[in-house]
Regions:
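Acidic, metal-coordinating catalytic segment for phosphate/diphosphate chemistry
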Residues: 13-55
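N-terminal secretory targeting and juxtamembrane "stalk" segments of secreted and cell-surface proteins
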Residues: 1-13
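Unchanged
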Residues: 81-105, 113-169, 185-186
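Acidic/histidine-enriched, glycine/proline-rich intrinsically disordered or flexible terminal extensions
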Residues: 173-187
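Residues that form generic nucleotide/phosphate-binding pockets
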Residues: 25, 40, 169-176
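N-terminal strand-loop-strand
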Residues: 38-76, 103, 107
């Protein structure tokens, strides 16, 4: 029997009912008000699905391009895939925004379940898509997301933004770059 003050009583669909229960459980466990939990996590319609994160692997010789975040760590250019963009379009857009480069998105290196490769674990699921790209123009320009861009060899990697990409993920990108018959890896 549900308590009369539970918001579950008015849930319109099974998805809404599950979302309400989840919000109440997370509220109880975290100490956050239920409305705050809903504001953060319950704004989607239907079943919750993973967010998509794209990362561009751009090479010059035997070096890979990384961008320096405002917190001084480094990552492959990339970010959340916008709802109105394909993975390919978004990867190209993110590289332009973060590294100032015009690129072509040439092949998918890997599709990974973020939880299996990156920390910390998020409260929502994320699929990471690594895309090998080629530069066709442009140059780094000052922006609000990144401080600089630079190419690094595998043995001289700087401190990484490991919530975005790990050394193992960058090694995987190098392996794909060096292989003519790379097959997309996926979890």
């Amino acid at each position: 029997m549900l308590p009369s003050n539970s918001s579950i009583v008015g849930a319109a669909s099974p998805e809404d009912w599950i979302r309400e229960i989840s919000a109440e459980m997370l509220s109880e466990a975290s100490g956050l008000p239920t409305e705050k939990v809903k504001e953060i996590f319950c704004n989607e319609v239907g079943f919750q699905t993973p967010k998509l994160d794209c990362r561009a692997a751009i090479f010059k010789g035997d070096k890979i391009l990384l961008v320096q975040e405002n917190n001084k760590t480094w990552s492959l250019p990339g970010g959340w895939v916008d709802v109105d963009q394909s993975v390919k379009q978004n990867t190209i857009k993110e590289v332009k925004e973060e590294a100032g480069l015009d690129v072509t998105a040439d092949r998918v290196i890997a599709v990974q379940d973020r939880e299996k490769h990156n920390l910390p674990i998020y409260a929502y699921k994320v699929c990471k898509i690594f895309v090998q790209c080629s530069v066709i123009g442009g140059a780094f320009q000052e922006n609000i997301e990144t401080m600089q861009s630079r190419y690094f060899s595998l043995d001289e990697l700087p401190p990484l933004a490991e919530e975005k990409n790990t050394k193992e993920q960058i090694e995987m990108c190098f392996q794909a770059y060096r292989s003519k018959d790379w097959e997309t890896m996926f979890d």
